[in-house]
Amino acid sequence: MTNGNNNNLEFAELKIRGKMFKLPILKASIGKDVIDISRVSAEADCFTYDPGFMSTASCQSTITYIDGDKGILWHRGYDIKDLAEKSDFLEVAYLMIYGELPSSEQYHNFTTKIAHHALVNERLHYLFQTFCSSSHPMAIMLAAVGSLSAFYPDLLNFNETDYELTAIRMIAKIPTIAAMSYKYSIGQPFIYPDNSLDFTENFLHMMFATPCTKYKVNPIIKNALNKIFILHADHEQNASTSTVRIAGSSGANPFACISTGIASLWGPAHGGANEAVINMLKEIGSSENIPKYVAKAKDKNDPFRLMGFGHRVYKSYDPRAAVLKETCKEVLNELGQLENNPLLQIAIELEALALKDEYFIERKLYPNVDFYSGIIYKAMGIPSQMFTVLFAIARTVGWMAQWKEMHEDPEQKISRPRQLYTGYVHREYKCIVERK
């Protein structure tokens, strides 16, 4: 994709070994501009070095904009707080995939297609039976999503219709697979999708209903989960999204690409942080212990860390956390736990103390999206091993939007990072009898 703001280019100058290079500065529509270093390796015979890609833009994108200093998160130009309060998850999914909010007719057609594709092939049931009963639901879902490649093996030569249909299939099937992963892990029968229910209701029904017991979805719980899904739908070029893009850049089957995103998301530094927050709050145990644990967090020689604080991008309050804090109170109030939920009380007091502490203020450590989401999940009856699974349901929308955008980009190339080699120089091979 070509950035339309770069007709009148400015240049940065870089001096390497006495030679001056002019590097184009690509203008962002908002936010930080980018220096184009794509010709440096060919012309200067050296690479750039950026561990963790903290200063590197790997692509151009129109999907998500983040200003970490100001606490801004926009999807296609819409503020995340507006989307969370006024929209629903499938409307946001449509926005992500197509770039615009849908009309009533477009929304109806889109949701109908999602419902139509929610079923998975019956043969997939046999795959679940190969896992031991103690398997983590993320492990099961990772394998199940990857196995969809076998059911759609022709998805290697794409056109625009294929991109859209593939995105719809993946968004539709991921909650079914997630619920199946949970049901198998607890030894209960699978529950089929119900097309009379909306996306979020359907997932909760597949999670908690049984063949002999109907599950009535509480509207407060449904709305809360809808917000959580919206808040987790996309977050620019994070680890899992970049993984999906890198896998997709080779032309791999899209279901295989999404499985790589799930694998990356499973890491405790990425999608598993909300489970770590719950464990931390349990460890703190009571409000009286908060000062002691805050002191431990400040001690660089103490391994204890405050989970749910700080973010690689945000240097102010995570806008998603602000929405989730209020959502958490709404859910617990509905369930009669607002005044007596010990985890919430510890979380609120811990946040209040941290926001007044110079140690956290100087380091710009504010609550992030993981700080309250786990408390909400736990109140809903969702076990901790399913927290990252629910994250994956929501983030699949972002992954598919990013995957689609990448394939539609005429400048797209197969990803090939370089390295700074620090190993041995050439060594002579010796036969084993000559080695000491």
From Swiss-Prot:
GO terms for cellular component: cytoplasm. Citrate synthase is found in nearly all cells capable of oxidative metabolism. It catalyses: oxaloacetate + acetyl-CoA + H2O = citrate + CoA + H(+). It holds the Pfam family Citrate_synt. One of its GO terms (biological process) is tricarboxylic acid cycle. SUPFAM superfamilies: Citrate synthase (SSF48256). Keywords: Acyltransferase, Transferase, Tricarboxylic acid cycle. Its EC number is 2.3.3.16. Gene3D superfamilies: 2.20.28.60, Citrate Synthase, domain 1 (1.10.580.10), Cytochrome P450-Terp, domain 2 (1.10.230.10). The keyword Acyltransferase applies. GO terms for molecular function: citrate (Si)-synthase activity. This is Citrate synthase. Belongs to the citrate synthase family. It comes from Rickettsia typhi (strain ATCC VR-144 / Wilmington). InterPro entries: Citrate_synth-like_lrg_a-sub, Citrate_synth-like_sm_a-sub, Citrate_synthase, Citrate_synthase_AS, Citrate_synthase_bac-typ, Citrate_synthase_sf, Citrate_synthase_typ-I. PROSITE patterns: CITRATE_SYNTHASE. The active site is at H311, D370. Pathway: Carbohydrate metabolism; tricarboxylic acid cycle; isocitrate from oxaloacetate: step 1/2. It is an enzyme of class 2 (transferase). The keyword S-adenosyl-L-methionine does not apply.
